[in-house]
C-alpha cells in the first residue's frame, strides 16, 4: 500500500508554518528548556487534530492488522513535499506513535527541492510506476494499492488499485493555533510568544478559509469510502487500471490539483 502525504494523509501546510515559526521563536529566545525533537512535534500535532484526515488513525490501524497477518507486505509514503526530508519523517513517526507500530517501510521523497535533486532513485516530479519499482525494489508485478489526491497517469496500470481521493484541506485561524499552544503548557514563559509567532506566520500571506459542518461531513464520508476500497483491495485482490475517484465530485474548491509537485510554499487562496 502506497500513500501520498499532503492532502491525502492529512493537511500539513499550516502545521509546517507553525513549526517553522516555533523553531525560530525557540532559537531567538535561546530557550534551552525546549528541545526541538519528535516528542515536541507529536505534542504540537496533538493540539490540532483537524489537520489529520478523519479516521486516518483508524485506517492505519486497519493496515497494521493486515501487516501483522502478512496480508500487506509493505507500506510506503510517496511524496512530492518540498520541505526537508525530516518533515515527512516527523509526520510518519507521529502516525507510528499513535498506532504503536512501525508501519511504514519507506519514504520516497521529492525528486527535486529548489532545483536540487533529493530522491536519487526518481527520474521525474511525476509519480510513476517505474520510479516506484526502482525506489522500493519490489517485484514489477506486485499488486499495489495507491492512494493520492492527484491523478498520475503513469501510476495507473493493471497492477495498481488506484484510490484517487478528494484532497483533504482544513484551515485553522493562526490566533486559534497560538491560543491552543499557549494553553497547552508546553512552554513555561509565554511572554511575547503570541506576537512573535504570529508575526512570523504572517510572512506567508496565508488566507484562512473556514470549513462548514457539511464539508466536514463529506470528509468523514470520504474516509469511510477509503476504508471500503482498502477492504476491496485486500478481499478480492482485483486490480484496476482506472482510478477510483473517491467522492471527488464534492470537491467544489479544487486547489490546483493538476500540479503534481505539491509544496509547502504558500500561495494566496481566496474564498
Which stretches of residues belong to each language-model region?
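C-terminal cap/substrate-recognition subdomain and adjoining C-terminal extension
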Residues: 84-257, 262-269
Amino acid at each position: 500500500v502506497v500513500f501520498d502525504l499532503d492532502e491525502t494523509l492529512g493537511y500539513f501546510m499550516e502545521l509546517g508554518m507553525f513549526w517553522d515559526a516555533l523553531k525560530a521563536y525557540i532559537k531567538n529566545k535561546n530557550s534551552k528548556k525546549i528541545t526541538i525533537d519528535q516528542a515536541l512535534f507529536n505534542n504540537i500535532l496533538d493540539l490540532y487534530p483537524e489537520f489529520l484526515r478523519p479516521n486516518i488513525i483508524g485506517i492505519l490501524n486497519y493496515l497494521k492488522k493486515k501487516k501483522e497477518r502478512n496480508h500487506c507486505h509493505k507500506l510506503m509514503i510517496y511524496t512530492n513535499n518540498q520541505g526537508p526530508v525530516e518533515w515527512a519523517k516527523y509526520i510518519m513517526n507521529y502516525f507510528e506513535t499513535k498506532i504503536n507500530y512501525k508501519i511504514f517501510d519507506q519514504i520516497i521523497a521529492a525528486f527535486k527541492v529548489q532545483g536540487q535533486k533529493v530522491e536519487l532513485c526518481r527520474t521525474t516530479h511525476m509519480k510513476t510506476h517505474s520510479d516506484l519499482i526502482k525506489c522500493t525494489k519490489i517485484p514489477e508485478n506486485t499488486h499495489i494499492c495507491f492512494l493520492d489526491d492527484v491523478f498520475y497517469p503513469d501510476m495507473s496500470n493493471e497492477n495498481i488499485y488506484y484510490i484517487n481521493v478528494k484532497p483533504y484541506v482544513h484551515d485553522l485561524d493562526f490566533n486559534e493555533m497560538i491560543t491552543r499552544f499557549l494553553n497547552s503548557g508546553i512552554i513555561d514563559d509565554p511572554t511575547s510568544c503570541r506576537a512573535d509567532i504570529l508575526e512570523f506566520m504572517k510572512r506567508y500571506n496565508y488566507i484562512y478559509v473556514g470549513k462548514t459542518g457539511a464539508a466536514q461531513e463529506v470528509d468523514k464520508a470520504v474516509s469511510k469510502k477509503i476504508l471500503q476500497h482498502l477492504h476491496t483491495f485486500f478481499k478480492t485482490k482485483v486490480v484496476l487500471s482506472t482510478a477510483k475517484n473517491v467522492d471527488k465530485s464534492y470537491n467544489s474548491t479544487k486547489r490546483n490539483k493538476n500540479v503534481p509537485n505539491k509544496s509547502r510554499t504558500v500561495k494566496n487562496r481566496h474564498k
